[in-house]
């Protein structure tokens, strides 16, 4: 099958959508499909060129703009001709995805079978998307809609008003994230909490530092430490919060790290924390769960796809409960051990084999809907 991946963001940029689209493309190629990526993100060849990256043809359709903005209203000129001969298009939508949206118009006018994956929780944008009516028309005219979690799919179902919206989750290489020799017992009296996120307001890194300060106050003997891995526009605000709370000796902000380093940091930690309320999926949390860490997050976020409360982590209704749950893990090593044992012996449902099969089913659904 010839599959066109259509996405605003792609490698070498690093983020949830970028990495997931690249990994899914590679897995599909390994199963015998032909995949090409169309994106606004520049690569080694710059803008307006085509390159082969990890065996996949990548068409770079962006233009050079200040602050590396990924906007090009002319990107879809000629796209229809480029998409001729493909069997299906797979559009990847984020909170703001002008290119992906333009691609929706192109593929619908072509009659090209199309599936659209929503990688975001619409939240306040739901009313605007509903009022525009475009997504509903796409779905009702045969575009196969899905989202990365049931949390992300729920507002989309209200918007499309009838056509089914399925779940196509993010995938993970379970073997790659499993510890090869079990988890080390550090035994130094320190409880290490870790999080990996973009330092953006939507991810709530400031609230995480504030919550952990309350955990330290509630469990002064636990030796609580916090490490937040990632970069973003909120770094300065997070650093000011650390200074205000006098937390420099127990909070570290190493920045963005590669996957191998992330695995090492998880191996040296005890608990993963995901404070975001608007988390559509939470791939970093899933990686930590596969690595054996108990995962603590908020009810109503995407991590509920792979975290069961009081089984392999905790799901809190609000920040006060989040503090209580984190405190429980800080002072009760037996609870941490129980959850870690479960996570190490129980594979999640989001392994790549299952996810690729689900993607293929979506492509078949799109082709059937297109007639």
Which residues does each PLM region occupy?
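Conserved acidic donor-binding segment of nucleotide-sugar-dependent glycosyltransferases
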Residues: 309-320, 328-334
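Conserved donor-binding/catalytic core segment of Leloir-type glycosyltransferases
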Residues: 185-212, 227
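A short, well-ordered alpha-helix in the C-terminal region of glycosyltransferases
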Residues: 335-349
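Short hydrophobic beta-strand element within catalytic cores of glycosyltransferases
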Residues: 294-297
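Carbohydrate-associated surface elements
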Residues: 151, 171
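Aromatic "clamp/platform" in nucleotide-sugar-dependent glycosyltransferases that forms part
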Residues: 277
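Short alpha-helical donor nucleotide-sugar binding micro-motif in glycosyltransferases
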Residues: 83, 256-257, 264-269
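Nucleotide-activated donor-binding/catalytic signature segment of Leloir-type glycosyltransferases, i.e.
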Residues: 239-257
